[in-house]
Structures are given as structure tokens and as C-alpha cells.
Amino acid sequence: MISLSLVLLLLFGVRCFDSAGQINDDSPLFISTSIDNSMNLKILVEKKPYFTGSVTGYKLYYTNDSSQTNEEYEKWMHQEALSNQNSYNFVIDANKHEIVSGDVYRVRATVFFNNVESVPTGVISINTRQSIPKAPLIVNTKILYNSSVLISFVPADDVNAIENYTLMYKQMEAEEWKSLNFKSDFDGKVLLDGLIPNHTYEIKIFVTGGIVQGTPSNLATFTTNSTALALVKTEPDEEYTADPQTNEPLSITCTVKSVSKASVLWKVNGIKVSVDSSFYTVVTSVHEDFIESTIRAKSRTRSAKFTCLATNDAGDSSKEVNVIIKGPGSPPSEITLVAEKRGYTISWKPPSHPNGKITKYVVYHTLNREDPLSDWRKIDLDGSEKMVRIIMDTEESFYGRVQAATELGPGIISDIVAMERDTQPISVESDLFGVSATTMVVNPRETLSIQCTARGKPRPSISVAISDRKNASQVEVDVWSRLQATSSAGIVSAVHNFSVLTSKFVHCRAKNSAGSNYSTMELKVDKPGDAPTQIQVLSVNALDALVVWHSPQFPNSPITSYIVLVSNDDKEDKSTWLQYESNAKETQINRMLLPTGNLEKSTEYFVCVRAKNAAGIGPTSSLISFITLNGGPDSPPDNLKVLINEANQVIVYWNTPNSTTEVTGYLIYYTRDLSLSNDDYKNWQFVEMNNNSTRYKFDLSVGLKPKTFYRVRISGKNSHADGPASEVVEFETAYSEVPIPTDLKTEVLDDNTIHIKFNAVRDPDDHSKALGEYRIDLAATDDVLHALWKQIEPKSIKIDEISSMVDVEIDGDSVEKNQMYWVKVTARLDNPSWGMHSSKPRWFRTGHGKLMTSVTLEGAPLIEKEPNLFEELSVTCTGMGSPAPIITWEWMNKSIENGTEGWNILNIQIDDTTVVSKITRNNIRESGDLTCLANNNEGSSSASVEIRVLGPGNPPENIILTAYRNQINVTWQESTLPNGDIMKYIVYYSENENDDLSDWNKFETAELETYVETFGPHTKHFIRVQAVSDRGPGIISNVLSCISDVLYETIHLEIVASNILDFEAEPNQNVEIRCKGTGKPQPELFYQFANETEQNFVEVETNDMDLFEAKAPEINSRRNVTVTCRASNKYENVTISKVIIIKRPGEAPTNISWSFEEEYDSTLYINWNPIENANGEKLEYNLYLSNYKTKVSGPPVKIPDIPLDVNISLRVSAENEYGEGEKTFPIWIPTPNGGPKTAPILSSLHAQDSKVYIFWVEPRLPNGEIQNYTIYIQKENESENEEHSIDKEWKKFIYGSNITHVIIGVDDGLEENERYQMKMTATNQRHEGPETKVYTFDLISFDENDVIDNFTAIVINSTVFVEVGNPIYTKYNIYIREDGNNQTVKHEIDVESGKTTFEFPFQLDHTLSYTIKMSGMKLGRESPPSEEIDLEFISSPSPTPIISGSRRKVIKEPPL
């Protein structure tokens, strides 16, 4: 009971206890519980085998009310069952009791012996919380050198990959476990450190953190630091130094010696080398006493730290080799050469493999490609430089190369970049197996062949690279492999064979001195690229073998499942192997229970694994083998015990083996021979027994020696083989057996007749003879210690000669009813010297002594009938009891009421103890159990008969007929009375309802729907359906009818273009489209152009051949356009599409712009918007420049050597591989005149003493040699409305190119007191250049006559009146200042010419004194001011003055 309670506690959160908290061993019942997925509680009660008496029923008490105590169990809810079996299953229904997760139920149970209830079991608590998580699986323990261990495990199927775990560990000899809590990852690994060196530990893992602790994993053991680390040596040893070299590989060899199994891997700069690396390859060979692994670099171009890592049971050991490349391993990248006026510019970027800090760059250049490099000119530059300009006047070919260097040395020199006259642009194409595409799907490890084809001049070389990078220009230089190429008719081609494990980009590169070009193809690998690794078979039993493996390194898309293949012949084709599929996990390690039940016993089997994803199945792993078991029990009996009973007999007890195979019997091995070892138990003496008991008594027939030490062990067996033996138990026999009856069992019959059974006692003087006389003593008491024994004469004593079992019968009248008795038995011996020895007392309880209620059914327990709506079912039941019982009937556990559902019951009482009941039913349609129940005051009894109907009891339901096309669809639902498993349906159909059913057409189907081919359109059809189960055919349905629909013919549709061939049209050409076809009923027609809204045809023509046709509006397009026709009727919706192919370019280029190079007039730049509809793969553009035509790849375009000072016409068209497209309208372009590009730069302009001084510098872009400068001067117009003067009014002053400043004055024709405008130009040997902007200057001057010296000023009220004696100005500036203050107020006055007086308003303080002065304005310049005079205040008014405009502002003057 203790072990059972522990199991229940672990599995279901269940505990078993009595009111005192102890397990109740007095109950005659075992009790166990379980919970199904629907939360139903299932309770199994079993009578303990050593309790005797007739079982008459069971009772289950249960409650979820925590307020009720365990002692009040009789007030709990309960279920009672009548049964004479030794076990019974109770079910507490979850729906009825509304059981939910988290409920806690307590249960107890009792058994009825002879209708007397026993003491209850202990209390079991059932918590309906979640079930316990399954156990993880420890796969591997990797011992590390620092007394730590890396543990790999696989999580159970019912937990997530990321979960909380507890790791329990202890030393083997220790009692106490230690724990480590951790959270798992997808790799399923955990590190346990802090262990003691050279000690053996055992570990287990289980899920924690939830409501219920998980099931512990398998135990794993390991010993820390029991193995030495592997010895690792490398060649070269620690450092390797070499010059960079692209055509020589680099190899490093690692030799590993280990006392245990070891594995080797390489790392470069700390990163593990992948098997699909495009630069590194690793070759490893395993020898008898060492492992040799070599890593090979494709070229000697990369400095790196190489690490050889060896792993064995002791941990990891490694050796590093530092590879130093003395200089950059690749040339500078992205080198470009640009031709400019008077030279070339070379630019570059740093090398991809600098192998240190770049300290300088060396640029080589020459005009003769064939010169040796030593004759090329050389330019040394700092490491920070990224370009250089080389001045050179020649227009011949130019060649350059660039090299980088570090402080360790120079690097790889670049290929030649060139600017040559006779070159042809490079084009390159690639195809795989003759197919050219941007993306192709390939299989992993498939041998692929790519052909690279190139054109160009000079002849290009061809290289190939397989990389993860999509951009070919970004692929590392040393990854490219140059191919052996062949040339024919200007076409260079090369072929490269390779394979890939995962998706890659394969690049073809064509390269010559003029540049390079690339062709790229993406290779998509969808299937798994490699096989699962590290296959292991961890355990094997009779049912299954546990296989674990690691996921593939290159899954390429999520792994959905794994396929495990098994065979006992590793040479057999894999297609014939047994295959088992298991779902994939997200973890690194996966597992599967491989069924072994059908495999041959004791046979070696081979296992391999394949990964599978959505794209297909990957390659097969390496093989691993295991040997199946012999078929016998796969575990030994446990808990073996040896006891000596009261008769000094040896009794052996054990537990049944926990075996996955059947145990049919046991072999009990025993010996007293000390020369035979425990492992040699097969040579011990043994006895055999069957599997109906786990107890064996060594009686005198075995012949054990008295007072002797024996060893015993037990193994299970079955028809295949013997199982492993148990542990060895030693025992010592007694001096002799005592003649005492043992193993008493009692049985009380209904009339209180008592049977006492036990093994016969052997005559101690003659062991071959069994004693036949016994004395029986009874005591009617509950207290055996104070019992008053009374000898009873038995009614009879019988001995079974075969089994030596004694059966003593005692008359029921000699005992009291309903009384507890104790019994003991004593053998009567002929030899009194042995004495009188009684058995152990045994208790039993008598019954009431009355006739038990019982029922019997006439006939067999199974009645089989074919379904019939008109045949009657009849069953007769006889009930007996005291008094005569009342008989009722149940159908499928539900009470039957007389006269309902076709049932009729007739009861006849024969006498006081017997009743006969006959039940009938008016049809035979339903299978089930029919039960007869008899009840009276003394008890109840029941008997059942199974009614098995041989076919469905009703026809399929909800039969629906639907006329559709040229058939009638028939659907239905399953019969509600299937009477077994429905296997098929029979469909009958006919044109004539009155035909005999045998004349109807019929067919069979397993589905719930089918169809019947019609006899013709608009025809009435009659249909019936019948279900057939695994027992036979059922009731056929009634007749249903349906009229078939109109005639149906499949729609066939096509699209025709009447004015073009093969659906190829010119750009913007009008195309006539017609849709036509056949089909019934006649469909409605629709058309659609590209993504426009679908339209229906207004007119549809038909002819006698049932052909329909419709014409769509004309369509034109500049690109490929899809034309769609759709025909739709009540049955079909058919759509077809065809593409009108536009091959030539769809339109002319637009938005054309042009410009000339700022520095060189003869270079023309043309740009335009690329066309939208190329309609081809190879698009070029035609330029028509007057009478000149050229092809270009696209805008912008640079055209040198354009003639100067002329008008040229420009037209542009697009052209693809199918032809030329539309040209643009002509554009007239005036070319530059060749003069300076910019005007002279005026540095100074000022006038003084009737002269103007002009300084300038040469134009920024003279566009040649300056010949002279021209200065233009004219008077500034006085009126704003006057038009600008014409060029002939400008005075020209021409000076030589060596003049940069001039002085122009009155002597040169300029006039004093005038304002002038000035501009200038420069002229080179070809033409005059652009003008500067227009500047202004004047030659105005003032003398003493220009100073105002005769004026007066007075103030009247708030107005100032001024009178000028000699007015020479029309604009005046008047300055008014307060005495003693330097702040002056300025007024600007405009007056008419010759006017002598004017006034302006001004607020002044009459208590203060003010002064006033004046100046005049001439041609925008102010004259010298007059002298200051006092401002006079007059209080009397004066005549009204003339008002003139005045502007006043405060100005700041310095003090006098």
C-alpha cells in the first residue's frame, strides 16, 4: 500500500491516509484512482487475496465538502454496486458532479462479504489539477577538465522546449541529494560545476515550477576527471609567417592522441569552420592510436588564428597556430580609372584582407601594356590616400595597377585597369544545365554544372564564386576561382561543377583590363541539406527502443518531422526498410520510441535517420546498430523476501517484474553449494511455477536440508525466453517442519455452511503421506486473546489428492447467525511424541442463513438477429429468493416501462420463492444489453443478455437529392442505430418506382455522399439508400424521387486576335479580340484587359453548331497586356487568358535634356528618362546626332569632340533584341562658340578726379588663351521708363591680354557730373566670352559755388519757413540742432526747380534756441553743407506758405 500511495501521489496528486494520518491496513480492499481527460474520476477497488468470503457487493463513499470529517464518511455521497467479482470500477461523472480543475475529492470504499459490510479503506484525496509532466531523458554527460560536467538531455513530449528544471545530484556513496535549479534552452544542455575530482556521481532531472513536480528522468552516472585530456600537436607549431600568395594554398595539420574516444574540429578566429565554407576545407582521418585533421585554406592571403579543438571524456583541449601574412592578401578594391582632360584619375578602396594597417599605396602606370612591371612608372602614396591624378597629354591607351602595403610588406598587386581605344564592353551570362534563370531550386549535394559565357575586348577571363552574398562585387577576392576557358567566334566560355548544402548565390565574373561584369544566379535549397548526426540507441526493451539524434546543421526550412529507418540487413535497399515518422521538436536533440514488438528476437538491427521539411526529405544519416532482446521478460522480479512461517516452512515472496512483455511463469533457483557463484545460477537447483501467484512455499517435497544456508533468486519467463534473475537472498532453514496447518481460508455460504480450506499436513514420520484427520475449534468472539474455544465436529473432511488441499465442511446449524468467529485447526497425529500444534487463528463472520436472491436468463448470453421491423424479440427471466423477488428490466442501464418503445412485460409467480418474467419487443433494430433485476428485502441480483443486431437498425437519415449537371447528387447522414461500425452504403436507383428492387441499378460507397448518372435531362429518378455495418446490411430507406436538370456540356473557351499573328503586336497597335467557345447551358460572356474592370459582352453570336462568339473593343498597349475571357453559367465559371506580346520598345524616351561640359565645350552631356516599357531583356538606346548614329546602354551619355558654333539635331530611340522603337521628335542644339566659359572677374571699380579706375583678373575658365579684354561704358538712363540702349551706344575700350587694370577719364570721352554703366568681356583665340554684370559709377564733383550760402529760416507756431536766395537744387537736406546738444534732426525736402521758398511742419520748444544748416542733392550725391545759422521764432502768423513734402529723421553728429 505504501508504494501504491506514492505512485498515486506522484501521478495524480493523490494521498491515502486514515483519520490518524496512517495508512489503514485493516481494510480487505486495495483502492486506486485515476482521472481521464474529461475530469471523470475512476476508482478501482480490489479484494485483497488473503481475505476470504463470498463477495456480494461494493460501496464507494466520496465528498468534496471540506467541512465533513473522515469519520463522518457514512454521511458522504455514495455509490453501491452488487457484484460477486473480486474487483469493481466506480466512476464519478464530471458533468453530473460539475467537477472542474482544482477540486479536491476524498474517497473511501467498503466490500460486502455475504451482504455484511467490511471496515472502510483509508481516505484517498484526489486533486483534479493537471497531471504530472513526463520525464526528460538524459542523453549524454560530457566531463570537463575542471571537474565540471556538461549534461545533454531531451525534454518530454508534453513540455515546452524552454522550461524550468531541477537537477538532482549526489555522490554514489552519499545519502543526501543536492539540487540545481535552471531554465532550459533549445540546445537542451546544462553545466554542473563545483564537483570533487575523481568521484563518481549520479544525476536525475525533472520539471519544476508548476503545480505538480515532474517525473524524474533516468539516472545517469559519471566520474569526474577519470580521463586525461587529449594531446594536441600542430604542424606548423605555434606561428607561421609567409608572403601573400593567391595561387598557393595554406595547410595546417593537427595530430590528436587520446586514451578515450575523441572528436576534432577547427576554429578560425574563434568561429567554427562550416562544412560549406567556400574558403576553408577540413579533412579528418581516424587511425588506430591517433587522429589526424588538416585544414586547408584556398590561398595564402589571410592572417588568422587557427585553433585545433579536441574533445574527449575529460573535456576540451586545443592548440593554436597564429598565421601571419606579411602584407595585404588582396589588392585594393573597387579600382576605377577615369579619363579627364590632360590626364587620368585612379581611385580605389582599401583591400578586403589588409592583414594589418595599410601604410602606403603604390600606383603603377604605363602607356604600353607589354612593358614589364619594372618599367612601369610608379607613384608612392600615403596609406590614407584613396585616389591619384596623373597629368598626361596623350590620348593613347593608358594602363594602371594599384598595390597596398603594410609595415610587414607589400600585398597582392591588382589586375590591370585600362583605358583603350579598341575595346568592347564586357557582357557575361550564366546557365545551369542549359537553363538561364535568376533563381533555381536545387537539391542538396546534387552535382551542378554552371556554364559562364562572356564577350568583350580584350578577351576577358572567367572566374566563379559561390557565396552567401548577393552582390557579386562584395564577394571577397580570394573566394573567386579562375576557370579554364575556351574561346570561339569572340565568345569565351567555361564550365564549373559543384554542389551546395544550403541556399547560395553563384556568381560568374568576366574581367579584362577595361573592367569587369557579373552574372548572378540564386540557388535555393529547400530540402534539408545534411543528415541528422550523433545517432544513438539509448535503451532497448521488448516494446520499443529509444533512439536520439541531433538536428541537421542545414535544415534550410523548418524541420517538420524525422523518418527513422530500420532493417536487419544493412546491404538492403533503403526503400525496403521499415520506416517510422516522428514530429520534429525545436530542440537540438530529438528522440523517438522505435517499436520493436514486431522485430525478430536477439537480432542486430541497423538504424538511420532522415530529416523532412515542407520541401521534401533530406539525406540519410550514418548507420548505428542495436540488438533486440530475446523476448523474455525484460526486467527481474524485485523486492524478493524469504520468511519462515509457523510450520517452519520457507516461503518466498516477490513483486511482479516491471516488464513490457508477458510473464507466464517463474523459475526459482536455489542452492546450498558454495562453489557455485551467483552468476552461475543457471546451474542451481530450480522449481517452476505459473504466474498466478507471487509466493512460493518450499514444502517437504522440495527437500531442503534442515539448518542449512541457502541462496535463492527468481527470474520470470514466457514462451520466448527466460528473463533476468532477481538479486540474491540468503536464508537458513529450521531444524525441522512442525505439523501445523497453514494458509487457512474460510468461506461462508448463503445457508451458513462453512468451508475451511488449507494445505494438508504431511505425516512427520512419512512425508509421502498426507494427514486426513483434523480437530476444528471455534470461538464466537471478537477478542481472540480471551476466546473460549469449542471443538466442532465437521460435517465432512475432503482431501484433493492432486493439490493436497483439505476442505473441511461445517454444518450451518451448528453456528450462530450474523456472528463473528475465530477458527483454529489442529492435525491429529498417530505419533504423540510430535505433540499437538494448532494453526494461527483465522476470523470469519456468519451470515443470516437465508436463501440469496438470484436470477437466471433462459438461453445463451448472446442473441444475434438480423435487423427487422416486423420480427418480435423475446427473453425469459426466472428470479428466486426468500421471499420471491420483484423482477424489473433495464435496457442499456435505463429502466423499461411496460408498453413503451415497443416493450411488453409479463410476470408470472410460480411459488413463494420463484417468479418468471417474459419481455418482448415488436421489432429488432437496436443492439444493447438487456438486464433482468430481482429485488427483495434480503438483497438483489441481476443477469444480462447481449442483443446483437446484425446490421444498422434504421436507414441513413436526412437523405437529400439534388439535380446537378448530368447527375443527381445524393447526400445523407449516418444511421443513428449503426449496430457496429458502418463499413459502406448501397445506393439503389431506377427510372421505374414499381420495378422489383432486384432490377434496380445499384453501387456501393464508403462516403456520406455520392452521385447517380442521369438517364437523361428532365427525367424522374427514384433512389433508395441502405447502410451496411461490419455485422451486415441494415434497414433500407424509403423511395425518394428527383427530376434531373438540363443537359450539361463542359465549357470550352478560346481567345482569337483577328489582325495579328501569334498574339504579337506592335506598340500602340489596335488589336481586335474575339472570345468564342462551346458549352451548355449557354454561358454569359465577359472580357477584361489587364487590371481594368471586367465588362460583359453586349452581343453574343451563336450558330447551329452551338458555337458562341463575341467581339471585344479594340485594345492597344505599349507593353504586354493580358486579355481575359470568362464564361459563366449555373454550373461553371471558366476563365482563360492570353497575353498580347509587345516585343519592340513601347515608346520613345522622354524628358530629354542636354548640357556641355563646363570646362571643355566640345563635350556634350545628354540625359533622358528611361522608357517604362522595355519589352525585352537587352535594352539599348540609339542616338541620332545630325548625320551621326551611335548605340548606348542608357542615360546619361557623354559625347566628346562636338563641333563648335553650329546647330546640331538630336533624336533618341530605344532598341531591344526584337527591334527599334519610336524615335523622339528632333531637338536642335546650338553648340558653344569656343570663347571663354566665364567673364573676367572685376576686382576693383572706383571714380576719382573725373576718372574711373578699373581692376580685374583673368576669367576662371578661359577655355584657351585670352587675346584681349573689352570694356563697355554708357551713360545711365535718367528715366525709369526709358528702354535700355542698344549696343552701338556703348563705348568700347579694347585692351590686350596682358592688361589687368585701366584708367578712363574725360580725355577718353567721359563727361563730368554724369553717371555711367559699365561691363566687360574677355576674348580668346576663338570667340568673345560672356559679359560681366553691369556696374555703375559717376564723375560728379562739388566746388564752392555748390555750397548754399544765402538762406533764412524762421519758425511760426509749428512750421519752419525757409527762403533760399539762389536755388540750384530740387532736393534739400535740412539739419536742425538744439544748442548745447549734438543730436540733429534731418529733413529731406523736394521742391520745384527754381523755387526760393518752402516750409515744413516741425514741433519745437519755443523756450530753447536752435540752429539750422542746409545741403543740396545732385545726381544722388549730397553737396557740402552750409554754415549753421540761428533759427528765429516769430509768434505772429504769416501769410499762408507753400507746403512741400518733408521727410524728417534724427541723425547723430559728432560735437563741434
UniProtKB/Swiss-Prot annotation:
Disulfide links within the chain: 254-308, 877-932
Region of interest called Disordered, as start-end residue ranges on this chain: 1419-1456
Residues in Ig-like domain copies: 236-322, 841-948
Keywords, sorted A to Z: Disulfide bond, Glycoprotein, Immunoglobulin domain, Repeat, Secreted, Signal
Glycan-modified residues: 64, 146, 164, 198, 225, 471, 497, 517, 658, 691-692, 893, 898, 969, 1091, 1120, 1133, 1151, 1207, 1268, 1277, 1298, 1350, 1357, 1382
Cited InterPro entries: FN3_dom, FN3_sf, Ig-like_dom, Ig-like_dom_sf, Ig-like_fold, Striated_Muscle_Regulatory
Stated name of the protein: Ig-like and fibronectin type-III domain-containing protein C27B7.7
